């Protein structure tokens, strides 16, 4: 997870790879019926259907590089050698064509990952607030998705069928020790995680919902950023004509004039205690909390 202290910090930037789809790259198995024409990973990987589809890749570039992103947006292109040139050639050529076009228009910079890392480390001492969003939907389902992340937490605000809800909230704490720090992993697969507050991907079941949902029907959302302050503000337009806002920052998120928020945690991630100041959790023996500073 991102470091909060010098003691646990490493000097090497670590980047999200693959160029993930802000809508379908999370919970992809639960959303698969919404995009029957494409299969595989919902990323920019040129081997898979999305990565070689011109309409989808043009959408990726627009959503990644035209929407507010605070510290900046990045995506990687290319594929592991084991996939072979025959499998990636069409998608890779398409993505290079689009990258060349956007670069010639002054909308992005194309560089090696090493160059990106050196530039990032020079610009930032700590992991900065960043945003990634999709304000249109290439599948035509009308879904909207806003991701915010910083060194303390991440969250995903999701709009589908008029319902606005959080589908993901995680706390970052560099005091949380990963499982294999002192004990080797002997299983076929390994688990690396952070501290879940809301984990829809893992905890939703046919019987239990997993979402923090706002009441009422929402027509649309729009974004505004304050790069200097590191804040992202979501303006929500409701079907009844009301307008309200959510603001994301390193300290958390705040709502102004928002309707009631219903909390559903799904299966296996309930808070261990609820008190007047918020919610207390325990994951793998590590206690953590989400505090409410105003409201009830």
Model-derived features: where do they sit?
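Substrate-binding cleft of secreted/luminal carbohydrate-active enzymes
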Residues: 54-120
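Aromatic- and carboxylate-enriched substrate-binding clefts and catalytic-loop regions
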Residues: 1-16, 77-82, 105-131
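Beta-strand-rich recognition/accessory modules
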Residues: 45-62, 73-80, 266-296
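Active-site-adjacent pocket scaffolds in enzyme catalytic domains
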Residues: 1-63
């Amino acid at each position: 997870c991102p470091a909060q202290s010098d003691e646990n910090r490493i000097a090497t930037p670590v980047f999200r790879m693959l160029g993930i789809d802000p809508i379908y790259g999370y919970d992809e198995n639960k959303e698969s019926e919404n995009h029957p024409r494409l299969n595989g990973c919902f990323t920019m990987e040129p081997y898979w259907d999305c990565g070689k589809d011109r309409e989808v890749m043009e959408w990726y570039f627009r959503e990644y590089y035209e929407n507010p992103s605070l510290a900046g947006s990045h995506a990687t292109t290319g594929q592991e050698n084991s996939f072979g040139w025959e499998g990636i050639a069409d998608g890779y050529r398409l993505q290079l064509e689009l990258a060349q076009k956007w670069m010639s228009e002054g909308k992005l910079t194309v560089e090696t990952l090493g160059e990106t890392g050196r530039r990032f480390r020079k610009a930032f001492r700590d992991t900065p607030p960043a945003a990634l969003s999709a304000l249109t939907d290439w599948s035509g389902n009308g879904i909207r998705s806003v991701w915010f992340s910083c060194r303390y937490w991440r969250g995903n605000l999701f709009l589908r069928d008029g319902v606005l809800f959080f589908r993901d909230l995680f706390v970052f704490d560099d005091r949380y020790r990963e499982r294999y720090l002192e004990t080797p992993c002997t299983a076929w697969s390994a688990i690396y995680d952070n501290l879940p507050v809301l984990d829809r991907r893992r905890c939703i079941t046919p019987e239990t919902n997993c979402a923090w949902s706002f009441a009422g029907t929402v027509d649309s959302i729009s974004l505004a950023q304050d790069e200097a302050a590191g804040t992202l503000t979501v303006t929500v337009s409701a079907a009844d004509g009301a307008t309200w806002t959510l603001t994301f920052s390193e300290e958390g998120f705040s709502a102004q004039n928002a309707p009631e928020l219903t909390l559903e945690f799904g299966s296996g991630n309930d808070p261990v205690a609820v008190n007047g100041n918020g919610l207390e959790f325990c994951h793998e023996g590590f206690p953590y909390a989400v505090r409410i500073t105003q409201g009830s």
